[in-house]
Design a protein with these regions (language model features):
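A conserved acidic beta->alpha catalytic loop
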Residues: 44-54, 71-73
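Mid-sequence helix-capping/hinge segment at a functional interface
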Residues: 384-448, 480
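Active-site and donor-binding regions of nucleotide-sugar-utilizing enzymes
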Residues: 309-397, 477, 496, 501
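Short beta-strand-to-loop acidic/aromatic patch adjacent to the donor-nucleotide binding site
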Residues: 92-106
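Catalytic-site signature of metal-activated, phosphate-bearing donor transferases
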Residues: 78-84, 107-308
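Nucleotide-sugar donor-binding patch of glycosyltransferase catalytic domains
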Residues: 500-569
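N-proximal low-complexity "stem/linker" segments adjacent to membrane-targeting elements
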Residues: 1-30, 313
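Donor-binding and catalytic core of enzymes assembling or modifying cell-surface/extracellular glycoconjugates
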Residues: 331, 444-516
Length: 569
């Protein structure tokens, strides 16, 4: 049965003032239109960067209304009220929310219309939504917040009062039903309830506090890099003026601190990186405790839709795909790159895997992973390939497709790799790959001794040599051994992914991972315990991995693997 609040069809609008927000404004507008906002009213306040160009791209969209603000002094409340008056004179708006370009509304409801309808149904005309401030790690060591674009994080923290004059209300913003004599105050955070006390009723003095599990404002206070936040501070130090506050108001300490930061960190961007992008500190410098950390994947999931729209628009000419490792995961990016090459002229890859450039012919260039935030990668758009957020019914490659917004497009291609590898061994041989990467190693590795025992059986059975793929082999030697082997046997690891590209008969032994995650070539035979999850109803890969014990692979005997090989060779 549909919810009753679905019957209420409010007209909901954003009021926003921007100045030089080229990194965020297009993302912000696009996201909130997708969330169901009817209008976004924007005061373009003396922007000199690409903000103007981005605004112009929305000139034919009747939902985005841009007003040019020429006064260089940044008086937030004055500009917001000017915008508010324009909206009310020319449009009929039921609800307003006041946002900056670096604030994104994350709600439990499917649309903002459903959200405001719920407020209305519960007689809440005035509510506040709290910030969750974004965290980034530019060392790229924390995958939850290692950014490749401006909103690329799932890690946030809830701010708290650090100064005696601060209240929790400083970290919240209002969403309010339109009413007579509406007036914005407190730097654009709230409205003046004294203008219409009867309208607000029980919320005349204190607006309803929306629980954080229902809604939050994902706030990119520090942007996504040090030089960007320094430029933001410079502009605020030069132009901000709060006309709704007395000159001795204690909260003006913030703007004084910003002016001090502009002096302190001039020509010292590295210290900003250290303090706010490595150590995770608040604006005031306090280290953020673990109990204030929260994770939210709203924007990460939405960015997929944004990425696809940009790709299909035809305006994107170059894409950089980012996947740090492991080897097999990076190999499986190739079909995705091939798919995207139908839309763009140039495809790049950024990865930690050395020698990756020698593997692929699909990529125009391969960059080092540590170049991701260096400004050295010249591309129109960048995106991480992440299968980890998809359910356990999809292959890794299909998970990658989902992460770029094309999840419904089935890709069953085997990666195409460079096959020109010089043969270094005379005669036929069986390649045994007994190693895995460190990730879930004990649950994925069948065991070195078992591989040795199996190799002896195979040498006798087929009167041939077995070569063990040991760590001492170089990357090119490994590729050569895989390319020219007669038969391959190994764990579910990088070499097992590579061998399929060369159409070799391969036997892959699975433990905590599952054959269904790999779209295998017709020459590949999976060997695994089919009964391991007989009672389970896992929905995620992590559940499946956690369910396995380290001893699970011991159930697969040497005899079983040997018999499977004899059956298929």
């Amino acid at each position: 049965m549909p919810n009753e609040h679905m019957k209420i069809n409010n007209v909901v609008a954003i009021l926003m003032s921007v100045r030089d927000e080229e990194s965020y404004i297009d993302l912000n507008i696009s996201y909130h239109l997708d969330l169901g906002f009817d209008y976004i009213f924007i005061a373009n306040h003396c922007s000199t960067d690409k903000t103007n160009e981005i605004m112009d791209s929305y000139k034919d969209d009747s939902r985005v209304i841009v007003i040019e603000e020429k006064d260089p002094i940044f008086n937030h409340a004055k500009i917001a009220n000017k915008l508010l008056n324009y909206a009310n004179i020319n449009y009929k708006i039921d609800w307003f929310i006041f946002l900056d370009a670096d604030e994104f509304l994350s709600i439990k409801d499917e649309t903002v219309k459903n959200f405001t309808a719920r407020l209305e149904k519960n007689d809440i005309p005035y509510a506040t939504i709290g910030w969750a401030n974004a965290l980034f790690d530019h060392t790229l060591s924390d995958y939850t917040c290692s950014p490749v674009h401006a909103i690329d994080t799932t890690k946030y923290y809830y701010p708290w009062p650090e100064k005696t004059w601060q209240e929790y209300g400083h970290f919240r913003k209002a969403i309010v039903k339109n009413h007579k004599n509406i007036e914005i105050v407190v730097g654009g955070h709230y409205v003046k309830t004294e203008n219409n006390p009867k309208f607000f009723g029980e919320y005349n003095r204190d607006p309803f506090i929306v629980p954080k599990n229902e809604a939050k404002l994902l706030h990119f206070e520090f942007r996504n890099k040090a030089d960007a936040v320094y430029k933001k501070w410079e502009k605020l130090a030069s132009f901000e003026n709060d006309s709704t506050s007395d000159t001795n108001s204690p909260w003006l300490e913030r703007i004084r601190t910003i002016k001090k930061y502009v002096e302190d960190f001039k020509d010292n961007i590295d210290e900003i990186n250290k303090r706010w992008f490595l150590e995770h500190r608040t604006f005031w410098g306090a280290t953020i405790p673990e109990d204030r950390i929260v994770y939210d994947s709203t924007l990460s999931l939405w960015y997929r839709k944004y990425f696809r729209r940009k790709i299909e628009s035809g305006k994107i000419k170059s894409v950089c795909l980012v996947r740090s490792g492991n080897l097999g995961d990076v190999i499986m990016t190739e079909p995705v790159a091939r798919f995207l090459s139908k839309y763009v002229d140039q495809i790049y890859l950024a990865t930690k895997i050395e020698w990756a450039e020698s593997i692929f012919n699909t990529y125009n260039k391969v960059y080092r992973y540590n170049q991701v935030n260096s400004g050295e990668i010249d591309c129109d758009i960048m995106i991480k390939l992440v299968y980890e957020l998809s359910d356990n019914q999809k292959t890794y490659i299909q998970g990658y497709m989902e992460s770029i917004g094309f999840g419904e497009m089935a890709v069953k291609d085997i990666p195409i790799l460079n096959s020109e590898w010089k043969n270094t061994i005379n005669g036929e041989y069986i390649l045994i790959a007994p190693l895995t990467s460190w990730w879930e190693e004990k649950k994925r590795n069948w065991g070195y001794k078992k591989f040795v025992e199996l190799s002896k059986l195979l040498e006798t059975e087929y009167n041939t040599t077995c070569v063990m793929l040991e760590k001492h082999y170089s990357f090119s030697e490994m590729m050569s051994l895989i390319r020219h082997c007669k038969l391959f046997v190994g764990n579910d690891a990088g070499p097992a992914i590579i061998v399929q590209s060369f159409s070799k008969r391969a036997f892959i032994i699975f433990g905590a991972t599952h054959p269904k995650y790999i779209h295998m070539s017709r020459y590949t035979v999976p060997v695994y315990n089919r009964n391991i999850h007989k009672l389970c109803k896992h929905r995620t890969r992590k559940e499946e991995l956690d369910c396995c014990e380290e001893f699970c692979m011991e159930r697969i005997t040497v005899g079983e693997v040997f018999n499977q090989i004899r059956l298929h060779v």
